[in-house]
A protein has these predicted regions:
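Flexible interhelical linker loops that connect adjacent transmembrane helices
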Residues: 222-246, 287-300
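Membrane-interfacial helix-loop connectors
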Residues: 153-164, 189-202, 337-393, 405-407
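Transmembrane helical segments that form the transport core of multi-pass membrane transport proteins
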Residues: 251-361
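Core transmembrane alpha-helical segments of multi-pass membrane transporters/permeases
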Residues: 68-69, 73-80, 86-115, 136-137, ...
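Hydrophobic mid-bilayer segments of alpha-helices in multi-pass membrane transport proteins
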Residues: 21-26, 40-81, 101-107, 243-250, ...
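C-terminal transmembrane helix pair
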Residues: 27-32, 168, 174-188, 204-219, ...
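Membrane-embedded helical hairpins/re-entrant loop segments and their flanking transmembrane helices
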Residues: 111-141, 148-169, 368, 373-376
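Membrane-interfacial loop-to-helix junctions in multi-pass transporters
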Residues: 100, 124-135, 163-168, 302-306, ...
Length: 441
């Protein structure tokens, strides 16, 4: 009897993933059509993402599930309050507020088919300070494109013969998280652009790139002074595969200059999928379609955690925004400048330390600050800084929890390993916020 009952459950688990993947692909196409001005409403893409999310719910467990449920409850309560008090119900924003962001994340995931760092299995692993610096730069650049996959690929190689050391873990953690400052393919950038309407990708990246460079330099200097650095086992990096994301970034900027009205997230998602298909066709035409389809069936469902997290964040932002607007409540601030942005940055990083995901802090801040109409670039830069520093210091960040599960690293150690680094980066970030404010006047 129990076996008969378990069969439908098992069958659902086997089929829900591929179906969810196809729904995500449909949502990417619908989102691109909306962003390119083809007359389709954003709610179609949002609905497809929500259907995929419902199918993929069983894959989301632990802290991510708790955070998702909490955001849905708070956001839902805000929507209900606004409806009861003011008769306002922003269902469309809750349904489709993050559809462009999700389409970008899903579209960029196709780049893993053509941009993975390759290495000969028999190639010797480099050692010493030079290997540390090269691995740091490698995880930063590849992570800026293929996201957390870069950390897993490099970490698998480094831990194949011996347990990962705290030095190796720090290199991967800092190098990866710094990409949040500038990368157009990083989740942080999508969240920043979605929650700071009017922000300019070029401006955000222009401010973020020097900060990332300073962070990499600081990390290389700090970690090269640690004991045992001469025995550091690095990754034999080859940077040839980076020409593809470089070409994609150039295409995005070029098309954006030619068509500035087209949303940047829509450009990234549509061009990422298109460029991946073209590269696969040029490499081996007979395998292009099978590889793309395999990614749809198996790769896209793996983003179930991000999918549900950002869907719930859309509900949270809509709920808080609706409640604030319905109640007529405003912050006691005349303007939102660099000083206020600095305080917000410190608050969000502090919340990250105790396990509050940056997307929750950003969605909440967006709902509260929207009535003040802050400089979108200033607030966008602040969000990117909060993401970069919060991810590197929090024991409960998705990256550190993934490293715990994969490599047996105690995530609480990152508070100690990255603590002084994070404080120094916050000083640099606050200085950059004030410099940007002075420059933009």
């Amino acid at each position: 009897m129990l076996c008969a009952m378990n069969r439908p459950i098992s069958r659902f688990a086997q089929t829900s993933g591929p179906i969810g993947g196809w729904l995500i692909l449909v949502a990417i196409l619908l989102s691109a059509a909306y962003g390119l001005g083809l007359g389709l409403p954003a709610t179609l893409a949002g609905t497809a993402f929500w259907l995929a999310g419902v199918l993929l719910v069983p894959r989301v467990v632990g802290l991510q599930r708790i955070q998702t449920v909490a955001m849905l409850l708070v956001g839902g309560a805000g929507l209900l309050y606004a409806w009861l008090v003011a008769g306002q119900l922003q269902l469309e924003k809750a349904l489709a507020g993050n559809q462009a962001l999700l389409a970008m994340l899903a579209g960029v995931s196709f780049l893993r088919l053509v941009s993975l760092p390759s290495v000969d299995a028999g190639e010797a692993d480099p050692r010493g300070p030079a290997a540390l610096r090269r691995t740091l730069l490698g995880v930063h650049l590849f992570g800026s494109v293929i996201n957390l996959s870069a950390v897993m690929i490099l970490g698998d190689r480094q831990s194949r013969r011996q347990a990962m050391t705290s030095l190796q873990a720090s290199v991967l953690s800092r190098g990866f998280s710094l990409a949040a400052h500038w990368s157009p393919f990083f989740a942080a950038m999508g969240v920043a652009l979605s929650n700071s309407p009017g922000a300019d990708l070029f401006t955000l990246s222009t401010v973020g790139l020097p900060l990332a460079a300073l962070g990499l330099s600081l990390t290389a200097w700090q970690l090269s002074r640690r004991s045992g650095v001469r025995d550091y086992l690095g990754y034999p990096m080859h940077f040839g595969a980076l020409w593809i994301p470089g070409l994609l970034a150039s295409l995005v900027l070029l098309v954006h200059q030619l068509s500035p009205a087209t949303p940047i997230l829509s450009l990234i998602s549509s061009l990422a999928v298109s460029l991946t298909l073209v590269v696969l066709l040029l490499r081996q035409a007979s395998q292009a379609l099978p590889e793309m389809l395999a990614h749809v069936r198996e790769g896209l469902p793996r983003m179930s955690g991000e999918l549900l997290l950002f869907l719930a964040a859309g509900v949270l932002a809509a709920g808080i925004g609706s409640a604030v607007q319905g109640a007529g409540w405003t912050l006691e601030l005349e303007t939102f400048g660099a000083t206020a942005a600095s305080l917000l940055l410190l608050l969000m990083v502090g919340l990250s330390v105790i396990g509050v995901h940056p997307v929750i802090s950003i969605a909440t801040a967006h709902g509260l600050l929207a009535p003040l109409a802050p400089d979108p670039n200033l607030i966008g830069i602040t969000y990117l800084m909060a993401w970069a520093q919060g991810v590197s210091i929090s024991p409960l960040s998705g990256m550190h929890l993934a490293m715990q599960g994969r490599f047996g690293i105690d995530p609480r150690g990152f508070l100690r390993w990255n603590g002084s680094y994070t404080l120094l980066m916050l000083v640099l970030d606050i200085g950059a916020l004030h410099l940007y404010e002075a420059w933009s006047r």
